[in-house]
């Protein structure tokens, strides 16, 4: 293929001039051999713009340290491609599909697919709606996940998005034996490291491929790593007919990386300084995540909400694509309720009688209305105290508090912090237990027995330990 020369370096953005009529296409990968102390290093660039005069503007996938004007650049003539298939399971990759887990490198015969692809055609899409059981009570009852759907985990810093994702990976692998692909997009390297070792210890890693572009990496890598992971997931869906789970932690960092390079590419910023192409970039990623008549990719995306502001363009753009949202609330973490899922703000389009069944729907709505009533009474309680409430309202408050605590749960992945064994609760059990609480069957059991437990059996056992007759 043709060769060019570096004409300008602006941080992660590099301009390259080619011979006339040999200008590479948009999204083509280019390679520069950058000299290092111990030999040379191959830096991959991706063409983002054609500026005219045979010059292209590219985004670097790694640090541009050592790149100088005049250096030779090789055009590969194709997009960045990553390994796909069984060989990816149990391994950790970077954005370019190179293994970074210090084990044997993959051999050259492995199939590689380009990371830029069209979304499935309209006639290939599946129209069936099927619920994905997670074993997490608050999710299964109030905001159930759909197979092949897109789920957003919304929350500010430190409210438990990553722990919830780890628990979901664990539950899906242990209970459903499903394949997961994890994309670490611009998050802490330490968390990725911990996740890898935890998954290795629990054996879940054998069913998981991991792709990382972490906080310390240039924006180019953080911008493309979600596409690399999605390409691996699409192979399992399209070629093997599997139901795959794609975890993206964190989709906000995907947007953030795009905004970092947008100004350097010469684009005029739009609202709050984000890139003008925000909705397009998000759409290109999200439209590829779907169910087809061959299999499904169900995506669970952690969405960091800057300053807890849900009107910020980044989380607001992600919202438009989601089937279900799981909102994490800081107030609940302060009360010691984990997972800190807000039962009134979390939504799902699957919570309909036609999909989940009449009983499930009614119990979920009754739980929400009881909690809503409790929220409305909190001001009165704060000013006048519980004694001023009517007997009916007192009963509502007591049941609402039991429900609130019972929505918390002990997680398998948090065993080392809590010292409690994790629990997986089937949907049927969850619905039956909450129905019993609403009916007043457990009004005599103290509130504290409902904290961080699995099913009602755990509550009864805990109450007996507290010396309460059940």
From Swiss-Prot:
Superkingdom as given in the UniProt entry: Bacteria
Binding site for ATP: 155-162
Class of the enzyme per the UniProt entry, highest EC level: translocase
GO molecular function: ATP binding; ATP hydrolysis activity; proton-transporting ATP synthase activity, rotational mechanism
Pfam families: ATP-synt_ab, ATP-synt_ab_N, ATP-synt_VA_C
Topology in the lipid bilayer: Peripheral membrane protein
SUPFAM superfamilies membership: C-terminal domain of alpha and beta subunits of F1 ATP synthase, N-terminal domain of alpha and beta subunits of F1 ATP synthase, P-loop containing nucleoside triphosphate hydrolases
GO cellular component: plasma membrane; proton-transporting ATP synthase complex
Enzyme Commission designation: 7.1.2.2
Catalytic activity annotation: ATP + H2O + 4 H(+)(in) = ADP + phosphate + 5 H(+)(out)
Subcellular location: Cell membrane
InterPro entries registered for this protein in UniProt: AAA+_ATPase, ATP-synt_VA_C, ATP_synth_F1_bsu, ATPase_a/bsu_AS, ATPase_alpha/beta_chains, ATPase_F1/V1/A1_a/bsu_N, ATPase_F1/V1/A1_a/bsu_N_sf, ATPase_F1/V1/A1_a/bsu_nucl-bd
Keyword Iron in annotation: no
Keywords of the record: ATP synthesis, ATP-binding, Cell membrane, CF(1), Hydrogen ion transport, Ion transport, Membrane, Nucleotide-binding, Translocase, Transport
Coiled coil feature spans: none
Record text on subunit structure and interactions: F-type ATPases have 2 components, CF(1) - the catalytic core - and CF(0) - the membrane proton channel. CF(1) has five subunits: alpha(3), beta(3), gamma(1), delta(1), epsilon(1). CF(0) has three main subunits: a(1), b(2) and c(9-12). The alpha and beta chains form an alternating ring which encloses part of the gamma chain. CF(1) is attached to CF(0) by a central stalk formed by the gamma and epsilon chains, while a peripheral stalk is formed by the delta and b chains.
Record function comment: Produces ATP from ADP in the presence of a proton gradient across the membrane. The catalytic sites are hosted primarily by the beta subunits.
Family of this protein: Belongs to the ATPase alpha/beta chains family.
UniProt-recorded name of the protein: ATP synthase subunit beta
Organism: Staphylococcus haemolyticus (strain JCSC1435)
Top-level taxonomy: Bacteria, Bacillati, Bacillota, Bacilli, Bacillales
Gene: atpD
């Amino acid at each position: 293929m043709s060769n060019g020369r570096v004409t300008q370096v602006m941080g992660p953005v590099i301009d390259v001039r080619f011979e006339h009529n040999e200008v590479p296409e948009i999204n083509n990968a280019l390679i520069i051999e950058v000299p290092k102390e111990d030999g040379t290093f191959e830096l991959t660039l991706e063409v983002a713009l054609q500026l005219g005069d045979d010059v292209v503007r590219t985004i670097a996938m790694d640090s541009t340290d050592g790149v100088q004007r005049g250096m030779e650049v090789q055009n590969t003539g194709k997009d960045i491609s990553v390994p796909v298939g069984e060989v990816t399971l149990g391994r950790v990759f970077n954005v370019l599909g190179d293994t970074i887990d210090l084990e044997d490198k993959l051999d050259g015969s492995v199939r590689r697919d380009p990371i830029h692809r069209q979304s499935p055609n309209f006639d290939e899409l599946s129209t069936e709606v099927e619920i994905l059981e997670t074993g997490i009570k608050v999710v299964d009852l109030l905001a159930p996940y759909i197979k092949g759907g897109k789920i957003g985990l919304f929350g500010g810093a430190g409210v438990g998005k990553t722990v919830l994702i780890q628990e979901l990976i664990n539950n899906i692998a242990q209970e459903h034996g499903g394949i997961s692909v994890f994309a670490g997009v611009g998050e802490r390297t330490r968390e990725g490291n911990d996740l890898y070792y935890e998954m290795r210890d629990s054996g879940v890693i054998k069913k998981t491929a991991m792709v990382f572009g972490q906080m310390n990496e240039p924006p180019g890598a953080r911008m493309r790593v979600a596409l690399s992971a999605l390409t691996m997931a699409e192979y399992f869906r399209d070629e093997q007919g599997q139901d795959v789970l794609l975890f993206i932690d964190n989709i906000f960092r995907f947007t953030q990386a795009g905004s970092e390079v947008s100004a350097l590419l010469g684009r005029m910023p739009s609202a709050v300084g984000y890139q003008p192409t925000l909705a397009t970039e998000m759409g290109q990623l999200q439209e590829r995540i779907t169910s087809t008549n061959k299999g499904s990719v169900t995506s669970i995306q952690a969405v960091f909400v800057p300053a807890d502001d849900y009107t910020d363009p980044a989380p607001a753009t992600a919202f438009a694509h989601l089937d279900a949202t799981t909102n994490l609330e800081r107030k609940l973490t302060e009360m010691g309720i984990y997972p800190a899922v807000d039962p009134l703000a979390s939504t799902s389009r699957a919570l309909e009688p036609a999909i989940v069944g009449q009983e499930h729907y009614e119990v979920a709505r009754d739980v929400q209305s009881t909690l809503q009533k409790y929220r409305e009474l909190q001001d009165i309680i704060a000013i006048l105290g519980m004694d001023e409430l009517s007997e009916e309202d007192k009963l509502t408050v007591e049941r609402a508090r039991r429900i609130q605590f019972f929505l918390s749960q002990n997680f398998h992945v948090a065993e080392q912090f809590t010292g409690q064994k994790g629990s997986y609760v089937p949907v049927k059990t969850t619905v039956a237990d909450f129905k019993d609480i609403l009916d007043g069957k457990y009004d005599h059991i103290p509130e504290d027995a409902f904290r961080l437990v699995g099913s009602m059996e755990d509550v009864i056992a805990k109450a007996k330990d507290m010396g309460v007759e059940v």
